[in-house]
Amino acid sequence: MKYAIRNTMLAAALAGSMGAASADSIPGMRGHDHTGVTVPDMQQAVEFFTEVVGCKKAMSFGPFADDKGTFMQDLLGVDPKAVIEEITLVRCGHGSNIELFKYTAPDQKDLTPRNSDIGGFHIAFYVDDIAAAKAYLDGKGVKTRMGPLPVTEGPAAGQTILYFQAPWGLQLEAISYPNGMAYEKDAETVLWSPKNPEK
């Protein structure tokens, strides 16, 4: 009980000393730094992102584990006996980084969520010429879906999209909007874009 009261008082004192936080932003938030993805085969993943997509490997480190305690669970919300065998970060042009994880865990599930599943996601790359991107991916034997599909109506009009997949099923997208999108005419907030990284 004393421990809980002491921690509550400490938290209140710290909050008071830091001043009022902005109600609409994490204090000091600058932008999206990276997206983390767990992969089944690190070598395959690094080769795909560097040799097919065109990203550059920045660094690798690991392993991380805790044989005796709950560090992995406490820090990452995974099984206490989970092991991160390796972490590799890649940089992909003018955009945030991708952090690749190779995990083992007693309760690990081997499934890739679809875009319609809760927790499903995809990573999109801006390209200057989406038809050329499609031809390139086809030439590399990458599985692509329908498209390139131009969006001609609504706020996203002006973009063209093409979904494709990594060899292990990760959903990816190529997107292009060389003349911008319709919403930009009247928008108070314009989305950040790798084609104009300074904006």
Role assignments for model-derived ranges:
Residues 1-9:
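Bacterial N-terminal signal peptides that target proteins for export
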Residues 23-25, 109-112:
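Short beta-strand/turn micro-motifs at beta-sheet edges
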Residues 27, 38-94, 132, 139, ...:
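Core segments of cupin and vicinal oxygen chelate
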Residues 65, 105, 178-180:
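A short acidic/small-residue loop/turn micro-motif
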Residues 17-20:
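N-terminal signal peptide c-region/cleavage motif recognized by signal peptidases
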Residues 103-106, 189:
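Short, flexible, mixed-charge acidic loops at enzyme active sites
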Residues 22-28, 32-40, 59-60, 86-102, 111-137, 160-165, ...:
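Vicinal oxygen chelate
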